[in-house]
Amino acid sequence: MKMSNIKKILALVLALVMVLALCACGNSSTPAPSEETQAPAEETQAPAEENTSTLVYATATFGQKFSPFFYTTAYDEEVVSSFTGGLLAADRGGAIIHHGIEGETVEYNGTDYTYYGMGDVEVVQNDDGSVDYNLTMRDDIVFSDGTPATIDDVIFGIYVMADPSYDGSSTVYALPIEGMADYYNSQQYLYKLLAEAGRDNTDFTLWDEATQTAFWASVDAAGEKFAQEIIDSVVASYNTDEYAATIEATPDEIAADPALQVKFGMNMWGYGDAWTEGATAADYWAAIEAAYGDIIEASDTETAGSSLFDLMDDFADYDKLVATGDDVPSIKGIIRTGDYSLTVHMTEYDATAIYNMSFIIAPLHHYGDVSKYDYDNNKFGFDKGDLSGVKAKTTEPLGCGPYIFKSYENGVVTMEANPTYFLGEPKTKTILFKEGEDADYVPGIVTGTYDLAVPSISEETLNAITDANSNGELTGDTLTTILVDYRGYGYLGINADLVNIDGDPGSEESKALRKGFMTVLAVYRDTVINSYYGDRAAVIQYPISNTSWAAPQPADEGYRAAYSVDADGNDIFDSSMNDEQKYDAALKAAVTFFEKAGYTFDADGKVASAPAGAPESYEILIPGQGKQDHPTYGIATAASKALETIGIKLSVNDVGTSVWNNALEGNTAQMWVAAWQSTADPDMYQVYHSSNAHGKGTNSNHYQVDDPALDALIIDGRTSADTEYRKSVYKQAMGIIMDWGVELPVYQRKDCTVASTIRVDCDTLPKDMTPYWGWKAEIETLAVK
């Protein structure tokens, strides 16, 4: 069960989640901030009645890294974004607000909302292809300890995240900011340099031969432990009759024989072809290293728990920075233009980069050393390569957000309203972020343990909610429920390299073959998804989350259901058809595609002959753990039965996650079902660009779409700043994806926020919640009764 880029993707997701959380700063229900600083005056009149209001929010176990730079879990991030301020705001669609200081109005779902932020951004695309992000910060931001914030606090934070020793989730260091790569790479960790140089390196400029020899000996010793950990994990988790049979053994035989355990571990992890008689854990590690040629990537991707380097007894000897050339004291493209302004100069335009411009406003005087900050002399609040002082404040956070971090004790984070917050002191005095189990969230709100939660949505959860309300509805006298579309969606994919005619994935015949399958599969979506999810999900028609600003809408010209025309472009369905008639019509339309692919049919409507080079059989992999419990399982089985009536065999293989994942990552799955979480920007590069197909790049284009026109549109879309233009470009790109017949959008499920109707003033929860505009988006106006 390869981890396969999961850690890299998780880091990107965490970073983006933090950006969007920091961007959620206010809306039209919040009046524009006054021009005067919100810091309290020296003399104030005591309120007539002390505000003692408290709200308890249910959350999962914290990683206890409450630092804007080093948080590691989404639950820590929820806390961090409550006391931290970000430079830019975002709207309900996840788009960046350019004019947050004065306020910017954006329509959503028929309502105009005005958004305020801590700063503005002006994007200037230069004639030479470079781009300037001119950032302006409000001049009245105050940290919760009373210290005014300036642009130097922002610059300090940028240099923390660009430091060669930085190991948090931000990827600012990867942006094409002028001089960034030179600054970041001017010092590198010795173990990374040794790993990159390889075993046969003969250049000993930065280390001696003895160091290199000792390093690789230590790697081999750790590698054997690394492989053994995988073996032990596989045996502990998958030694069942079903999986043991994959190596023609029984669970008892595997449990009793270490050699069989190695074979089983290699096979289940996708290394069955590398196994030889008598193979050991050391041989297994050698196979892993050979497969990657990069021990760092191998460690990140193949881990069963521990990093390779965690298992090196002498890793500390190599976990140190080494100067790789002349010192680079600053980043040329980070330009201070005033006490409250900054320009970021990038060598090229990337539409996704603007999300990184909502830099943390991090108090230099708290996380850094003011005596070590002098912008003009290339001093940025700490010694380059040493973030120990910043990390030391991980459990003592400070910021300029709506709340002040007070403590973490016994699984509870206590936060108090920040009177200096730029949108005004929050109405709820105290918020407790309380650890708990997801299954206990809704019952806990009913009993008074919690006031608000975001539980995983399931039939059991919805039943618990409706049972608690006297009206039997999701919102009633006990609980108030808000359903929001999930950021990702479920889909069915086809590997074009494996499902084609005569080895030509891009031919019209190959596209027709795949569209024949998709036409039959698509028609069963409404019935099956409604049966499986009910109100918890809806069928979608395009390969993009409905939450994206680039998603086609039903009112758009040319909008149509996925795979709803035949091979001649004629509509398959009409409004008078019932479900059975639609199924029959879809099957007949599929035949037109199969005929275009080269199939012939006899008088009884069954396949008479298949085209040369067509696969002999077809298979869909579904990770239902052998229990048929997957939202797309019913679609696949219904389509399989329908196709069987015309003589085409489509097998539905319900497998464990490891088998499914190995097939997907090894690009051996003809067809598969999956779901993913999308980002705020609809950039398609990672999933659909040919540079990531055929095992190249990130190996994330599992469809193996290799289309120059699609590649050009993807690049065009990510290099334009015009949102409407990008939307039209992505609409064309989605058309090509659908024409290749490699993806069937299936469903978009929903998330939910549940609050106590009794204790929370639910009228103060945000209106028109979205994945990018949740319950915390207007936390300063959220009130309890």
Residue ranges of predicted features:
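Gly/Pro-rich hinge or "lid" segments in bacterial periplasmic/extracellular proteins
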Residues: 89-95, 290-332, 338-341, 345-350, ...
